[in-house]
Amino acid sequence: MKLLAKAPLNLLRAFEAAGRTGAFALAASELELSPSAISHAIRKLENLLDVRLFQRSTREITLTKEGEILLEHIQRGFNELQQGLALVTADESRPLRLHTAPSFAHQWLLPRLGKFIRENPSIDLRLSASTEYARFEQDDFDLDIVYGEPRPSPYEKIPLAVEELTPLCSPQLAERLKKPEDLYALTLIQCDVQLYQWKGWFEANKMTPPNNYGLRFDRSFMAIAAAVDGLGVVLESKLLAEREIASGKLVCPLVNSTSEIHYIGHYLVFPQHQHMHSALDVFKTWLLNELNLGKIR
């Protein structure tokens, strides 16, 4: 306890945030402090412990070997502390705070949300969507549905459905799309933040990618909406476009004549201590069942 008395919690929080984010500025933004305050706190911690925790240069900071060891143990301790707080404050009315990728929320989750609410009327679900990663350390969120492979972290991650990317278009436009080569004469809609894009699809099908695309968006739900309106052919996930395909607003004209791209597009991420949150377990089970992944826990 003598060593712990040397290191106040505010200094440990500043160090943990800086070590995890790799930048004083990012840690400062997260903790709502100034970068100089973060730097001062870490310098004070180093002096108190008589250990150098960071190597500093004009452009970056990197953890020393001692810093890496301390960061691992502090994060483990914070998780234990969070778990203890959850145990003594457990409450049926505690909200479940979900963060998710925008297009997954808009295209897949929202159409099913009514079913979840009807089945679980006592759960206070609060939903937020952005392309940023959820912040668990400040207790902002309980779980996160992220697009793409999550960054390295101590959190649990569950891969969600294997998604299939295929050209999609309106039934009217499909009349002009009988073979893969017909794509060259049509407007191609591209989502610029997508992991796999038209170039990769053309190469997978041993075709030369075109030099230009007609429309570009930074969200899949906008690209899908443009295709529904007949503005072009979009390369998109059949999972995200499930509702439009089922209703006949979009069709897959080349699905039997081309090689499609398969990949794990989304992951469920949450801290281990959140196992103590009963509503999280209910939502996780429901989500996996809806994705036909009920055997994964």
UniProtKB/Swiss-Prot annotation:
Alphabetic keyword roster: DNA-binding, Transcription, Transcription regulation
Stored Pfam families: HTH_1, LysR_substrate
Name the UniProt record assigns to this protein: HTH-type transcriptional regulator PerR
A GO MF term: identical protein binding
Domain HTH lysR-type: 7-64
GO-annotated biological processes: DNA-templated transcription
Entry similarity comment: Belongs to the LysR transcriptional regulatory family.
Ranges of the DNA-binding region feature: 24-44
Gene: perR
Role this protein plays: Apparent regulatory gene involved in peroxide resistance in stationary phase.
Organism: Escherichia coli (strain K12)
